[in-house]
Amino acid sequence: EKNTSYGVDAQRTWEIHPRATAVVGMDLVHEIYAKLPTSASREDKRYARNNWGLFGQWEQRFDARNTGIIGLRETWTTGAARGQNYSNLSASAQWLHKLDAKSSAYLNITQSFVMPTFSQMYPKNDMQKAAPDLKPQKGINYEIGWKANHGGHTWKAALFHVNIKDNITAKVNTGRTEYQYTNEDFRNTGIEVSDEIRGKDG
């Protein structure tokens, strides 16, 4: 088996005015999967597809304490085998409020879209089963939190909720020592507390 990918990406940033910044960009990745003949099998299969993306972001600094950021991304594929092409528009929004010079509160709402890779859809070793009908995963993440810098520490506390439809995950069949990637819905709600310590040299 051989997986190959290559692509290009570009983006540009504009300072619209002292309180607003816009970013626009695109990316393209061409993927190729080849199941090459071996001494054990003469099977020769090849698949390819193009992954396209267009995205934009607007950052608005309302005042010294409040900043809002919104973003949009369109993702689509072309050239996929068996007509397995997809298209999705996802959005994101963030609000940042500075409490003081060293601490801030924030709110994030982000939609996600993740295509399955060829290495998840097609076997890359003898233990993996093919999953050619694997679907993209779509989700939404909500997070509200607090950050603070103090004395070489970066403190963070956050409450989050994740809801993903068709989450891509590997299922292991221990009885047959094999695994296969599948889609299953996933939800998770939790609290995250962390402390990042920075040394004198960073």
Walk through the language-model features, giving the residues of each.
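Short beta-strand motif preference
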Residues: 24, 144-146
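Face-selective signature of the C-terminal outer-membrane beta-barrel domain
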Residues: 1-86, 92, 96-98, 153-159, ...
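Surface-exposed extracellular loop regions of Gram-negative outer-membrane beta-barrel proteins
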Residues: 32-34, 78, 83, 88, ...
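Outer membrane beta-barrel strand-and-loop segments of large Gram-negative receptors
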Residues: 5-12, 47, 51-55, 131-135, ...
